[in-house]
C-alpha cells in the first residue's frame, strides 16, 4: 500500500492503481464521462484532469505515486472542465426535449455541474445517418465520441464490433484560438469521428454498448419513445437465468390508465461493476398470469400421492428448503439430473475456495475444461476476456468443439480440440506438469514413449555441418592443418572414423546420440500432440496466478468421481484456483439444500415444481399483453414476481425482488397444508440451514449493491461447505489410474443452448434474437443445401426431433448444436452425454 494526499486528505491505495480509481475508493469525486471501471482508459473527455505535484495530469491513466499531492478542484481545473462541456454542448439544446436519455443523461448532469449557462460556439450541422445493430439504435447526431461503447465491447464483452471511424464533418480551425488546448482536443475528436459497427459477424442480444452510453446516442429499440426516465421505478434484483446471478435493475411503470397494471420497460445494470448478457437485459417479458391459481387442495393432494418431485434448476433457495422438508415428511424422491450430478461431484471434491469474478480478472493464465464457456456463464467469459485484454493473461480453452469466438479474443487465446471423454486424461496431464504425485498417473506414465526430437536433430546437423565447413577451411592453412583436424574429430564424428583409435570411444558415443523427447501415448490418443503439450507446459510454468474453470460437462462425465478426486488433489497441492460453473441458475443452492436422487426414467407419479411432471406447478409463461403459452396445473409466480434468494457461482446468496404483481399463491401456501407455518417464502430465508453454509439473516436485511471501491456488498457468501465431510471420507482411497479412451467417439451432434438461451423463460421470450433451435456452421449449412429459418428433422434409432435451423458464426466443425428444449420426451437422444451421432432425415 502507498499513501497520497488528495485535497488535503491522506488516503491509502494499491500500488499500480490509477489516481482516479484511488480517489473513487476513498470517496473523492473526480468527474469523468469516458471512463469505465476495470477497462482501459481512452482519455477522450479529459474531464478527469487533476494537478499532481503541481503538474496537470489525467487521473484515469496516471498511476498513483507514493507521497503525491493532488488537487482536483482548483479554479483553473473547474474553468477547463466548463470549457470542455461547452464544446460538448455545441448545437445541443440545454433543455432536452424528446430524447430518451433526458432525466438520466450524463451530459445534462455535467453541464449543470460545471455551470454552463451560455454557448459561445456554433457550427453548421452535418448530415449523419442513423445506424442500428442487434437491439441498439445509434443516433450519431447525439454522439459525443466518448467511445465507452467501443471500450466495453472490447474490454468486457470481447467482441471488438465497434470502432471510432473517420468522419468528414465541419471542424473549423478558428476555434483553436478561442478554445483551451484540452477543450479543442475534445472538440476535434468529436467533430472528426463517428462510431461504426465493424464486426465481421452480426451482433445479437448484447446491449452493453447501450448501457454504457452516457447520452442518447445509443438506445434500446423497443424502449424508444415509450417512457420517461423520471416516471420509472427502479427495482434492484438478481438475474436468475444462469449461475452468474448478475445485479440488475427493473425499470417499471404503470401501463394502464388506472395504474393497476405495471410493465417492465427495460432492465439496467451497474455497468461499472457488472456487465450483463442479452438474456439478463432483454428476457424480462416473460412472467406468470397475475391472478395465479386457486386449486391449493389439488396441488397438495398431488404431492401426497406422488413418488417423486422433479424440480427446476432455477427454484429459489426457499422453495428448495421447503421441498426438502416435505421430502423428509412424505418420503418421496427429488429429481434434478443436472443438480444431482453436480451434488455428487461436490461430495467428492469437498471444500474448495471459490474465486470471485474479480479474481478471474487478475489471473495470468486461465484454463477451461469441460465447458462451453460463452453459453454456460457469460459473466465468466467477460471476466476472462478482461484478464486477457488488461492483465495480459493467456487462455487455454480445451473442448471437443472449437469456439472461434474464444479463439479470436486475442493472440494469447488458444483453443485446443480434443477427443470426447478425454477430460480425465487432460486433468492427469496438468497433474503431471505440476509434478503432483498421484496413483491416477500410473496409466499415463505407462504410456510414456521416446521419439526423435526433430528440431534438436536439425539443429545438431546444422552445427555439425558448420563445424565441417570450418574444418575444411582450416585444412588450407598448412601449419594449422593437423591441429584443426584433431580439434574437430569429436565434433564431426561419423561412422567412417571408427578406425581412429585415439577418438574411437568418444566418436561412437557421439554418433549414437540422437536427441529425443518424451511423449505420452495416452495424450496422443486424446488429441494432445507434443507441440500442444509443450505449449501448455510453457504457459503453466510461466504463470504465477493460474485459474482452472471446470464446466458442467465434467459433472456428468463417466469418470466424474475420479476427476473430482484429482481436482481435490490439484487444489491441495498447487496454487491453482478452481472455478466450478454450476449447471443451472441455482444448482449450488439446490445441491446444498436438497438430498437429490438420480432419475432413472421409470414410470412414477411425478410432481414437477418449476419443471414438467404429471402434475405441474410452475409459471405459465405469459408474455406481457398476451395469453399464457405453457399449460400448468398450478400457477406459481415467475422469478420476477416473488421475493426469495438464489446462490450464484461465487457461493453468494443473492436476493430476488418482485417487479410485477402476483395475487395468487406461492409454494409456501401449498406447504401450509402439510403443517408448515411459513406464510411466505421470505419467512424461510433466515431459516436456511447453517450446516449447509447459510446464515441466519432475514431477507429484508440482505444488501444488493457495489461500492465505488469495487467491493461487492451483494447478499452474503456461503460458509463451511456441507460436502467436506463426505469428501474427507473419499480421501481414504487413492485416485484410480486414468482410464484410456477405448475408442474415439464419433459425433455430429452437441446438446447446448446458443448464447442468451438458458431455460424456459428465455425460450419463451419474444425479445431475444437468438432462439432455441438447431445451430450449424456456415460451411455445414452450405453443405446441407439449406437456409436459415428452414425446419430440419434429425433422427436417432426410431426417434425424431424437429427444430428450426440457425447459423452459428463461431462454429467450424460439421456438427448440429441442438437446444435442450427440443428434446422434450425424446429420451433416445444423448443417452451417454452431450455428444451424440444423429442422422439427417430428408424432407419429403
Language model region names:
Residues 45-63:
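N-terminal single-stranded DNA-binding subdomain of primase/primase-helicase replication proteins
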Residues 61-66, 189-192, 405-411, 543-550, ...:
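Short acidic (Asp/Glu) and glycine-rich catalytic loops that position anionic groups and cofactors
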Residues 8, 54, 796-798:
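Residue-level detection of beta-strand-connecting loop/turn positions
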Residues 1-24, 32, 36, 40, ...:
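N-terminal export/assembly segments and adjacent metallocofactor-ligating motifs
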Residues 1, 30, 35-39, 324, ...:
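A cross-kingdom feature strongest in bacterial/archaeal respiratory oxidoreductases
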Residues 94-123, 129, 149, 159-165, ...:
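N-terminal leader/propeptide and maturation segments of large enzyme subunits in energy/redox metabolism
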Residues 315-317, 371-376, 553-559, 613, ...:
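Short acidic, S/G/P-rich loop/turn micro-motifs used as interaction or catalytic elements
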Residues 411-483, 487-610, 691-720:
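Active-site phosphate/pyrophosphate-binding segments
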Amino acid at each position: 500500500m502507498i499513501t497520497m494526499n488528495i485535497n488535503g486528505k491522506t488516503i491509502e491505495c494499491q500500488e499500480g492503481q490509477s489516481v482516479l480509481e484511488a480517489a473513487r475508493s476513498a470517496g473523492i469525486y473526480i468527474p469523468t464521462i469516458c471512463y469505465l471501471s476495470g477497462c482501459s482508459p481512452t482519455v477522450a473527455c479529459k474531464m478527469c484532469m487533476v494537478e499532481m505535484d503541481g503538474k496537470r495530469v489525467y487521473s484515469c491513466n496516471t498511476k498513483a505515486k507514493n507521497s503525491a499531492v493532488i488537487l482536483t478542484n482548483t479554479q483553473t481545473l473547474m474553468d477547463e472542465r466548463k470549457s470542455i462541456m461547452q464544446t460538448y454542448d455545441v448545437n445541443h439544446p440545454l433543455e432536452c426535449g424528446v430524447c430518451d436519455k433526458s432525466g438520466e443523461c450524463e451530459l445534462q448532469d455535467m453541464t449543470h455541474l460545471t455551470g454552463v449557462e451560455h454557448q459561445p460556439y456554433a457550427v453548421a450541422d452535418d448530415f449523419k445517418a442513423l445506424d442500428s445493430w442487434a437491439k441498439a439504435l445509434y443516433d450519431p447526431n447525439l454522439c459525443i465520441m466518448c467511445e465507452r461503447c467501443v471500450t466495453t465491447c472490447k474490454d468486457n464483452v470481447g467482441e471488438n464490433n465497434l470502432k471510432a471511424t473517420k468522419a468528414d464533418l465541419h471542424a473549423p480551425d478558428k476555434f483553436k484560438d478561442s478554445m483551451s488546448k484540452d477543450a479543442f482536443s475534445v472538440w476535434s475528436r468529436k467533430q472528426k469521428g463517428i462510431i461504426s459497427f465493424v464486426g465481421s459477424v452480426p451482433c445479437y442480444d448484447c446491449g452493453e454498448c447501450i448501457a454504457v452510453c452516457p447520452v442518447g446516442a445509443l438506445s434500446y429499440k423497443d424502449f424508444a419513445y415509450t417512457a420517461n426516465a423520471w416516471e420509472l421505478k427502479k427495482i434492484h434484483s438478481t438475474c436468475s437465468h444462469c449461475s452468474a446471478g448478475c445485479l440488475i435493475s427493473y425499470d417499471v411503470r404503470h401501463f394502464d390508465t388506472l395504474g393497476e397494471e405495471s410493465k417492465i420497460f427495460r432492465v439496467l445494470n451497474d455497468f461499472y461493476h457488472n456487465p450483463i448478457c442479452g438474456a439478463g437485459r432483454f428476457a424480462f417479458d416473460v412472467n406468470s398470469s397475475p391472478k395465479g391459481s386457486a386449486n391449493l387442495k389439488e396441488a397438495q393432494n398431488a404431492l401426497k400421492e406422488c413418488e417423486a418431485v422433479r424440480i427446476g434448476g432455477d427454484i429459489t433457495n426457499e422453495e428448495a428448503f421447503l421441498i426438502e422438508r416435505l421430502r423428509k415428511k412424505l418420503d418421496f424422491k427429488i429429481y434434478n439430473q443436472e443438480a444431482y450430478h453436480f451434488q455428487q461431484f461436490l461430495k467428492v471434491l469437498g471444500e474448495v475456495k471459490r474465486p470471485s469474478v474479480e479474481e478471474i480478472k487478475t489471473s495470468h493464465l486461465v484454463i477451461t475444461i469441460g465447458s462451453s464457456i460463452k453459453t454456460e456463464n457469460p459473466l465468466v467469459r467477460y471476466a476472462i476476456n478482461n484478464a486477457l485484454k488488461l492483465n495480459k493473461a493467456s487462455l487455454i480453452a480445451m473442448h471437443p468443439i472449437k469456439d472461434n469466438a474464444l479463439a479470436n479474443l486475442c493472440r494469447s487465446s488458444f483453443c485446443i480440440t480434443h477427443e470426447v471423454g478425454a477430460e480425465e486424461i487432460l486433468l492427469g496431464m496438468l497433474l503431471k506438469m505440476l509434478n503432483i504425485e498421484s496413483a491416477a498417473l500410473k496409466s499415463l506414465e505407462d504410456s510414456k514413449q521416446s521419439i526423435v526430437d526433430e528440431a534438436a536433430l536439425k539443429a545438431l546437423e546444422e552445427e555439425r555441418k558448420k563445424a565441417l565447413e570450418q574444418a575444411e577451411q582450416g585444412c588450407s592453412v598448412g601449419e594449422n592443418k593437423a591441429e584443426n583436424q584433431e580439434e574437430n574429430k569429436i565434433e564431426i564424428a561419423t561412422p567412417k572414423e571408427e578406425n581412429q583409435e585415439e577418438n574411437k570411444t568418444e566418436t561412437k558415443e557421439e554418433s549414437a546420440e540422437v536427441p529425443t523427447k518424451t511423449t505420452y501415448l495416452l495424450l496422443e490418443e486424446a488429441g494432445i500432440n507434443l507441440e500442444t503439450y509443450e505449449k501448455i507446459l510453457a504457459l503453466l510454468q510461466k504463470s504465477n496466478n493460474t485459474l482452472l474453470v471446470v464446466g458442467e460437462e465434467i459433472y456428468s462425465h463417466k469418470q466424474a468421481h475420479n476427476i473430482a478426486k484429482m481436482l481435490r488433489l490439484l487444489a491441495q497441492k498447487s496454487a491453482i484456483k478452481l472455478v466450478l460453473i454450476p449447471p443451472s441458475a441455482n444448482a449450488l443452492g439446490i445441491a446444498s439444500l436438497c438430498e437429490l436422487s438420480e432419475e432413472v426414467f421409470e414410470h412414477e407419479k411425478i410432481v414437477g415444481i418449476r419443471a414438467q411432471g404429471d402434475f405441474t406447478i410452475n409459471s405459465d409463461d405469459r408474455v406481457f399483453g398476451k395469453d399464457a403459452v405453457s399449460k400448468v396445473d398450478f400457477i406459481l409466480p415467475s422469478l420476477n414476481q416473488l421475493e426469495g434468494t438464489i446462490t450464484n457461482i461465487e457461493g453468494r446468496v443473492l436476493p430476488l425482488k418482485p417487479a410485477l404483481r402476483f395475487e395468487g399463491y406461492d409454494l409456501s401456501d401449498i406447504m401450509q397444508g402439510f403443517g408448515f407455518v411459513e406464510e411466505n417464502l421470505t419467512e424461510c430465508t433466515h431459516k436456511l440451514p447453517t450446516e449447509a453454509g447459510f446464515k441466519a439473516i432475514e431477507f429484508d436485511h440482505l444488501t444488493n449493491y457495489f461500492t465505488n471501491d469495487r467491493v461487492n456488498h451483494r447478499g452474503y457468501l456461503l460458509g463451511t461447505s456441507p460436502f467436506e465431510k463426505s469428501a474427507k471420507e473419499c480421501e481414504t482411497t487413492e485416485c484410480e489410474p486414468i482410464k484410456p479412451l477405448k475408442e474415439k467417439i464419433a459425433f455430429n451432434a452437441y446438446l447446448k443452448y446458443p448464447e442468451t438461451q438458458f431455460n424456459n423463460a428465455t425460450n419463451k421470450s419474444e425479445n431475444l434474437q437468438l432462439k432455441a433451435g438447431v445451430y450449424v456452421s456456415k460451411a455445414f449449412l452450405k453443405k446441407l443445401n439449406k437456409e436459415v429459418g428452414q425446419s430440419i428433422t434429425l433422427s436417432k434409432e426410431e426417434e425424431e426431433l424437429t427444430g428450426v435451423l440457425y447459423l452459428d458464426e463461431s462454429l467450424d466443425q460439421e456438427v448440429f448444436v441442438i437446444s435442450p428444449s427440443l428434446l422434450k420426451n425424446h429420451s433416445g437422444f444423448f443417452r451417454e452425454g452431450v455428444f451424440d451421432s444423429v442422422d439427417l432425415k430428408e424432407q419429403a
